[in-house]
Amino acid sequence: MNRVHTITLAAALLASAVVTNPVLAETAAEAEEGQRLFREHCRHCHDKGSPNGKYTPMTLIQAQWERFFDRKYERKHRKVIDEKFGGVPVTEAISPEALEKIRTFSIDHAADTDQPMTCG
């Protein structure tokens, strides 16, 4: 088999594995949902020029995001009132399920990952 055919076959096999693998598809869907939730709940207070500081997933490394969500999130946000979501504290405006998706998105796309992201 010549080199072009080998490369074409390898690319086709890889593409079919990605398309037919439900785990990869679910991961992509979860990342998209995490990004949407980050934009919806976090960005309006943590965007460029914000007095709260600009934060995107690639602002911190994975260990810093883990430490933030494990130790600092509740303390830093429980008294912050979120006018966008009915004037309740941020910790009440974001459900535990949504927070977990935001956490996963932030950690999976931190500065020290293969796919660092902003929220564009």
Where are these regions (language model features)?
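Bacterial N-terminal signal peptides
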Residues: 10-17
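Electrostatic cytochrome c docking/interface patches
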Residues: 20-37, 53
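Short Fe-S-cluster ligation motifs
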Residues: 70-94
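C-terminal capping alpha-helices of c-type cytochrome domains
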Residues: 87-120
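Short cysteine/histidine-rich zinc-coordinating motifs and their immediately flanking basic loops
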Residues: 53-60
